[in-house]
Amino acid sequence: MKSIVFVALFGLALLAVACSASEDAHKELLKEVVRAMVVDKTDAVQAEERECRWYLGGCSQDGDCCKHLQCHSNYEWCIWDGTFSK
């Protein structure tokens, strides 16, 4: 009888250790996923800042617009600058 109780308690202790190790691994995985999401958002913001604005895209200066476009002074959107080239 004592040995059965001892084995049952020992089994429960092993199960608790295994669950706690699994929980730690789960927490680490969650941290990695969150880090990856934050890095991806940071990269996306940087990419948006470098891209030019297309036709009728909002702008504040000519440098914001793509090639052959200029920033319209009244409406602040990119319009064609009247040039042709390849």
UniProtKB/Swiss-Prot annotation:
Keyword set includes Transmembrane: no
Localization terms from the record: Secreted
Keywords recorded for this protein, A-Z: Disulfide bond, Ion channel impairing toxin, Knottin, Secreted, Signal, Toxin
Signal peptide: 1-21
SUPFAM superfamilies with a match to the protein in the record: omega toxin-like (SSF57059)
Propeptide intervals in chain numbering: 22-50
Tissue-specific expression: Expressed by the venom gland.
InterPro entries named among the record's database cross-references: Huwentoxin-1, Huwentoxin_CS1
Any one GO molecular-function label of the UniProt entry: ion channel inhibitor activity
Pfam families from the UniProt entry: Toxin_12
Highest taxon of source: Eukaryota
Gene Ontology terms: cellular component: extracellular region
Disulfide bonds: 52-66, 59-71, 65-78
Major localization listed first in the record, in broad terms: secreted
Family: Belongs to the neurotoxin 10 (Hwtx-1) family. 17 (Hntx-9) subfamily.
Protein purpose: Ion channel inhibitor.
Domain observations: The presence of a 'disulfide through disulfide knot' structurally defines this protein as a knottin.
Protein name, as recorded: Omega-theraphotoxin-Hhn1f 3
Highest classification ranks of the organism: Eukaryota, Metazoa, Ecdysozoa, Arthropoda, Chelicerata
